[in-house]
Each structure stands twice: as structure tokens, then as C-alpha cells.
A protein has these predicted regions:
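Soluble non-transmembrane domains of integral membrane proteins
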Residues: 1-8, 13-186
């Protein structure tokens, strides 16, 4: 059964139908779903997998990205359909509105000639929705990366995820050759 939300706009977003939108540059094509405001597929252009098929870093239904937080009640963004506020070839902005007038915003963009997707998470006018004593949120991203190379053992050993804290010049690394997690307090 679906949980009942105190915020009527969350209930509406939970029941809404998702839509799909693409960002694309000369290097990469990313399809997003509004359900959870997250990447749905990621295709690398000009490269092929070991079996000569298109090279997908993320295939359909192989990724789940959600932000868990307390916003008057416990929520996880993966459960809600966001509204598209802006979309063109290189940028998409999706928002999850709350009845109090605030919203959670996910902005994704691609720059020409780059394989990197940029992401900016914002909490806009959420002062009356997220209590002041809430200083943490959990970002959970689970993704199954398809086999891309013929030598799976070598591929697994050298696969990793890097992320940057705002203002950092050197990336942090999660999980080379294994599952990994990182806790970041806000």
C-alpha cells in the first residue's frame, strides 16, 4: 500500500506518471526519468562495448538514485515524480514542489566536448518545511554497470566512482573494485 503523506503535493507527485527527457552533447547521451529526477540511461557515443553493441554505462532500470530526508515527514525522492521546470539539449531542471511553496530541485547539465555530467541539488524556500535541526540527508545511488570489456576481472578491479566536494580540486574516491559508500554530513 502507498503511504499517506501529510503534504498533498507529495501525494500528487507519488501518483503522477513519469516522463523521459534526453540531454546530449557530442560525447554522451543521457536519458532522465522524472521519477526521482534521475538518470535512466547513459550512452557513450563513438565507443562500443566488447561485443560491438552500443556502450551504455547505465541501462534501463539498472540505476536507482534517491535522497532521503525529513521534510515534516520522512521522504525519499526516488518515490516521487518531479516536474520539469526547464529542458533543452544540454540542461534539465526538475522540481519536487511542497504545499508550503518550497521545492527540491535537481539540475543536470552537460558541457560540449565533455563526458562529465554536472549535477546541482538545491532546496529552495524549504525553511518552513525542513526543520532547522535537520543537518543530514542520505543520498543513495545504486547502479549495476553492465559488462563493457571482455576481461571482467580486470574491469571490476579498475572501476571506481569519484566525486568532488564543492571547492575541492582533487576528487574523493569510492570503491575501486568493490562496493563502497561515503557519509557526508551537511
Amino acid at each position: 500500500t502507498m503511504p499517506a503523506y501529510k503534504d498533498s503535493m507529495l501525494t500528487e507527485a507519488r501518483l503522477a506518471s513519469a516522463s523521459f527527457h534526453k540531454l546530449e552533447n557530442d560525447k554522451i547521451e543521457i536519458e532522465f526519468t522524472t521519477k526521482g529526477a534521475q538518470p535512466y540511461t547513459v550512452k557513450i557515443k563513438d565507443y562500443k562495448a566488447y561485443d560491438s553493441t552500443d556502450l551504455y554505462l547505465i541501462k534501463p532500470q539498472a540505476s536507482e538514485y534517491g535522497i532521503s530526508l525529513f521534510a515534516g515527514e520522512n521522504i525519499n525522492t526516488k518515490d516521487f515524480v518531479f516536474q520539469v521546470a526547464e529542458h533543452n539539449d544540454s540542461t534539465i531542471i526538475m522540481q519536487l514542489p511542497f504545499a508550503g511553496g518550497g521545492y527540491i530541485q535537481q539540475k543536470f547539465w552537460l558541457e560540449s566536448g565533455s563526458y562529465m555530467m554536472q549535477n546541482e541539488l538545491s532546496f529552495v524556500n524549504m525553511d518552513g518545511i525542513i526543520p532547522r535541526n535537520v543537518s543530514m540527508l542520505d543520498i543513495d545511488w545504486s547502479v549495476v554497470i553492465p559488462r563493457l570489456e571482455k576481461g571482467y576481472k580486470n574491469e571490476k578491479q579498475y572501476s571506481k566512482l569519484d566525486f568532488y566536494y564543492d571547492g575541492d580540486k582533487k576528487p574523493e574516491e569510492i570503491g575501486r573494485g568493490r562496493d563502497g559508500s561515503e557519509r557526508i554530513d551537511t
